[in-house]
């Protein structure tokens, strides 16, 4: 399995209700300290690196064959559209740019444009070591 992009407590899980039940989370929100490093979960090419309403400072990495990872609510983005990144490379810094009450990272995995539960794909460093 892949490593989660940041260490911290998952406060919102895939499929949980939000906005008084009108919407569901398409990813997970990981509480983490402002400025904490955000790591790419896999090798790929940055296809978006900018501010997007609802996501704040967002980076999207295409991993090929329809697989993408999304990293939102960042304080800073360290790679630009078109850049290639390696698994484990620092790509951003945790922030609160997406309008959440706490600092942290919003993280999604998409396959052919459809959100998938990141917890089916990723583990913490502690879980990997066990």
Ranges and model annotations:
Residues 42, 63, 73-75, 95, ...:
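Active-site proximal loops enriched in glycine and acidic residues that flank catalytic Cys/His/Asp
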């Amino acid at each position: 399995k892949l490593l989660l992009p940041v260490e911290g407590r998952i406060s919102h899980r895939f499929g949980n209700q939000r906005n008084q039940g009108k919407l569901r989370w398409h990813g997970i929100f990981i509480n983490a300290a402002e400025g904490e490093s955000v790591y790419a979960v896999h090798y790929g090419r940055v296809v978006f690196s900018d501010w997007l309403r609802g996501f704040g400072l967002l980076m999207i990495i295409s991993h090929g064959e329809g697989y993408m990872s999304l990293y939102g609510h960042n304080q800073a983005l360290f790679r630009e559209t078109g850049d290639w990144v390696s698994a484990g490379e620092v790509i951003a810094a945790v922030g609160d740019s997406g309008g959440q009450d706490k600092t942290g990272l919003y993280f999604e995995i998409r396959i052919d444009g459809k959100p998938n539960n990141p917890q089916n794909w990723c583990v913490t460093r502690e879980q990997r070591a066990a």
